From Swiss-Prot:
Residues 270-286 are annotated as: Linker 12. It comes from Homo sapiens (Human). GO terms for molecular function: structural constituent of skin epidermis; structural molecule activity. PROSITE patterns: IF_ROD_1 (PS00226), IF_ROD_2 (PS51842). The lineage of its organism: Eukaryota, Metazoa, Chordata, Craniata, Vertebrata. The gene is KRT85. Gene3D superfamilies: 1.20.5.170, Single helix bin, Vasodilator-stimulated phosphoprotein. Residues 431-507 are annotated as: Tail. Residues 124-158 are annotated as: Coil 1A. Residues 287-430 are annotated as: Coil 2. Residues 1-123 are annotated as: Head. There are two types of hair/microfibrillar keratin, I (acidic) and II (neutral to basic). This is Keratin, type II cuticular Hb5.
Length: 507
């Protein structure tokens, strides 16, 4: 550190004091504190003027460089400086000699850092990046708020859905009861159909017995018909034999007639040739023609009566056989129709029974499936409820994390706002000081874990560098904690309080 002081006195009783002080903080130092006691020069005499210049430079990689000037005016004298402003006692109202200090002719080595503008530019870029990060944090907070609203909407929807799902159990129970009643009805129908099937089977057995009896009667009738046909054939053969005998007898009678006629003619010829008178007793009176005619008539009568009786008997038998055949055929046809009808009824009842059995099996399967689906739905609902509760718990945890991050982001935003306001205030104070000039300022730069206060407003932060300045133009002090750009981003806690000291501390 270098410090120079100059004193100039004029002949008109005006004394000017000039001082120069430069301080360079170590490069790797973590805490640098430079303080300058304020000079409160008060003089009621004329011609007192003081001027001071001080340069503070911290060449560390993470710290800022700050140059501060102070001004304090009295009633008749002015002084400039950090440590001790030029103080001059009251001078007598006489002409004094002028003394020139040759050392003032040498150029002042203010040791102004040429990289100060670059450092300021870097600080501006850091502020811009911090603002960008803050905007990103704000967007993230908005996105997380949207996600929170979405999760709340989902949670309300799932709660409503849970209420809807709670009504599924009575619905399933009612449906199962309906299926059970239908199954009972099907069982009753199956019992009724089984009794009807037994009755139909009994009727079928009766019809089968009747059919067998009719078949036996038909076989008996056919046997009788065969016997009658044999009798008819025998009668026809007998008739043929009789007709043949009749023809033979007719031929024989015709032969005998011709023979007798020839004998009679021969005898008549002999008789005509001889005249013999014979007297004989012909009491027998045998007339062959009458006998033959009578026999022939009797034979014809017997033959005609036999033919008529045979024909009538044959016709009657044929009519009886035809009637029997027609009757048995009609009975057989009706029996066949009844058998076909019974077969169709049996097939229909069998199909209905099979259909009832299939329907019963389907209903039992449907009841079992409905019970399984109900159990599966209930288990699925329980699983979904557990998942939703887990998701709700996770959402609450995520919400807590998001709220924590949001609080951290808001803390970062608040710190950045305070930092920006502090930098703006420092710049405005520096410009005001350069334009008007004020008293001396105490500046303290430190790196610590502390809080920030601004006009009674305190704010606690993470470890950083603290810059403390002494009395300002408004009669207060400014304390600034600059964020350590090399430190990792960590959660920060904050608190604010207001007072009269007008100190600012930010992270």
């Amino acid at each position: 550190m270098s410090c120079r002081s100059y004193r100039i006195s004029s002949g008109c009783g005006v004394t000017r004091n000039f001082s120069s002080c430069s301080a360079v903080a170590p490069k790797t130092g973590n805490r640098c504190c430079i303080s300058a006691a304020p000079y409160r020069g008060v003089s009621c005499y004329r011609g007192l003027t003081g001027f001071g210049s001080r340069s503070l430079c911290n060449l560390g990689s993470c710290g800022p460089r700050i140059a501060v000037g102070g001004f304090r005016a009295g009633s008749c004298g002015r002084s400039f400086g950090y440590r001790s402003g030029g103080v001059c006692g009251p001078s007598p109202p006489c002409i004094t000699t002028v003394s020139v200090n040759e050392s003032l002719l040498t150029p002042l080595n203010l040791e102004i850092d040429p990289n100060a503008q670059c450092v300021k530019q870097e600080e501006k870029e850091q502020i811009k990046s911090l603002n960008s990060r803050f905007a990103a944090f704000i967007d993230k907070v908005r996105f997380l708020e949207q996600q929170n609203k979405l999760l709340e909407t989902k949670w309300q929807f799932y709660q409503n859905q849970r209420c809807c799902e709670s009504n599924l159990e009575p619905l399933f129970s009612g449906y199962i009861e309906t299926l059970r009643r239908e199954a009972e009805c099907v069982e009753a129908d199956s019992g009724r159909l089984a009794s009807e099937l037994n009755h139909v089977q009994e009727v079928l057995e009766g019809y089968k017995k009747k059919y067998e009896e009719e078949v036996a009667l038909r076989a008996t009738a056919e046997n009788e018909f065969v016997v009658l046909k044999k009798d008819v054939d025998c009668a026809y053969l007998r008739k043929s034999d009789l007709e043949a005998n009749v023809e033979a007898l007719v031929e024989e009678s015709s032969f005998l007639r011709r023979l007798y006629e020839e004998e009679i003619r021969v005898l008549q010829a002999h008789i005509s040739d001889t005249s013999v008178i014979v007297k004989m007793d012909n009491s027998r009176d045998l007339n062959m023609d009458c006998i033959i005619a009578e026999i022939k008539a009797q034979y014809d009568d017997v033959a005609s009566r036999s033919r008529a009786e045979a024909e009538s008997w044959y016709r009657s038998k044929c009519e009886e056989m035809k009637a029997t055949v027609i009757r048995h055929g009609e009975t057989l046809r009706r029996t066949k129709e009844e058998i076909n009808e019974l077969n169709r009824m049996i097939q229909r009842l069998t199909a209905e029974i099979e259909n009832a059995k299939c329907q019963r099996a389907k209903l039992e399967a449907a009841v079992a499936e409905a019970e399984q689906q109900g159990e599966a739905a209930l288990s699925d609902a329980r699983c979904k409820l557990a998942e939703l509760e887990g998701a709700l718990q996770k959402a609450k945890q995520d919400m807590a994390c998001l709220l924590k991050e949001y609080q951290e982001v808001m803390n970062s935003k608040l710190g950045l706002d305070i930092e920006i306001a502090t930098y703006r205030r420092l710049l405005e104070g520096e410009e005001h000081r350069l334009c008007e000039g004020v008293g001396s300022v105490n500046v303290c730069v430190s790196s610590s874990r502390g809080g920030v206060s601004c006009g009674g407003l305190s704010y606690s932060t993470t470890p950083g560098r603290q810059i403390t300045s002494g009395p300002s133009a408004i009669g207060g002090s400014i304390t600034v904690v600059a964020p350590d750009s090399c430190a990792p981003c960590q959660p920060r806690s904050s608190s604010f309080s207001c007072g009269s000291s007008r100190s600012v501390r930010f992270a």
